[in-house]
Design a protein with these regions (language model features):
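N-terminal Rossmann-like FAD-binding beta1-loop-alpha1 element of flavoenzymes
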Residues: 5-33
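Glycine-rich FAD pyrophosphate-binding loop
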Residues: 24-49
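Central helical "cap/lid" subdomain
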Residues: 40, 141-193, 256
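N-terminal FAD cofactor-binding segment of flavoenzymes
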Residues: 44-83
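Short beta-strand to alpha-helix junction loop
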Residues: 61-68, 82-105, 236-245
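A conserved short coil-to-beta-strand element within the FAD-binding core of flavoproteins
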Residues: 112-126
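Active-site substrate-recognition segment that forms the wall
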Residues: 182-234, 241, 245, 249-254
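Flavin (FAD/FMN) cofactor-binding core of flavoprotein oxidoreductases
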Residues: 251-287
């Protein structure tokens, strides 16, 4: 019996997880590598050790516009992995935003804390260079799902021209940054509903984390997203400076002094896709190298899911 084709996937966000699940279900051997401490990518969550509070400091909600992701959302909702929140058709993940990605990757070979620094390919297949460990295996195919500039750097690490012709679209992708601020506060902040969207100024949105499904009884805590313009203007400032500035902006917005019991800022350099690659995925059939992500279809979790699934279908057909 022939061994199943070996596929390496770089990135354990929604696009990588979607591709991994499709390929694994089709009978291929999948290995996922991610530099983060946990899976999820920008569907990120952080648990404060002192308070035990969970903060979704990246993507906040999931929405479905097309049938494929709607079917997946319905299945997750039936199993308690997502639940309606904030507005009709909008879902939060339970217990945090990594849950859908963790579900897709369940039972698969996943390596976190592994930074892929280079790629090589010869007649035998693909090899990965890792910053933290050695990886001796040779893979039959390779899927890249990091933000487009990071994927482009990996492709550039190869011999000139290798696998590059089909990936010019990576240079079309553009992103806006976002500073995220996680706050635990003594009492619920005085704004109506679960999400505050001022419409102007440094703050794009404030999300009432303690009101999310599955967090009943949690102490008051919020996540604040700065506007793309403010984030770009302050991109290289220290987290401490950003914390102070955004806390002051929130206090001014609400007309009150805010004394958080916990605060932490996180910078997302590639937060929001503002220009796409112009295709559902990028693929070089001769090299068996593909790229998927929200950079292909737009700034939504659904776009990352659809892109990863579409690339997986194409790759599965080639490997069959």
């Amino acid at each position: 019996m022939a061994r199943p084709a070996q596929v390496a996937i770089v990135g354990a966000g929604m696009a990588g997880a979607s591709a991994a699940r499709r390929l694994a279900d089709a009978g291929f051997a999948v290995s996922v590598f991610d530099k983060g401490r946990q899976v999820g990518g920008r569907m990120a969550s952080r648990r404060d050790r002192e308070t035990g509070l969970r903060f979704d400091h990246g993507a906040q909600v999931l929405r479905a516009h097309g049938p494929a992701f709607r079917h997946r959302l319905d299945a997750w909702r039936a199993r308690g992995i997502v639940a309606p929140w904030d507005a009709p058709g909008t879902h939060a993940a339970v217990p945090d935003m990594t849950a859908p990605v963790r579900d897709l990757l369940a039972g698969l070979e996943v390596h976190v804390g592994r930074t892929v620094t280079g790629l090589t390919r010869n007649a035998a297949g693909w090899r990965l260079a890792l910053a933290e460990a050695s990886e001796a295996r040779v893979f039959d195919a390779l899927v890249l799902t990091p933000p487009a500039p990071q994927a482009e750097r990996l492709i550039d690490s190869m011999a000139p021209g290798l696998g590059a012709p089909g990936f010019a679209g990576l240079r079309k992708a553009a992103y806006a940054p976002c500073w995220s601020l996680m706050l635990a506060v003594p009492q619920e902040l005085p704004f109506a509903g679960d999400v505050l969207r001022p419409g102007e100024g440094p703050i794009a949105a404030v999300f009432r984390e303690s009101a999310k499904p599955g967090r009943s009884g949690a102490a008051p805590h919020v996540t604040l997203h700065a506007s793309p313009e403010w984030s770009a203007a302050h991109l290289e400032e220290t987290p401490e400076a950003v914390e102070a500035a955004l806390l002051a902006a929130l206090g001014a917005l609400l007309g009150m002094a805010i004394a958080p019991t916990h605060r932490r800022a996180h910078r997302w350099r590639y937060a929001l896709v503002t220009a796409t690659c112009g295709a559902p995925y990028l693929y070089d059939a001769a090299a068996r190298l593909g790229y998927a992500g929200d950079a292909c279809l737009g700034p939504r979790v659904e776009a990352a899911y659809d892109s990863g699934a579409a690339l997986a279908e194409r790759l599965a057909a080639d490997l069959a």
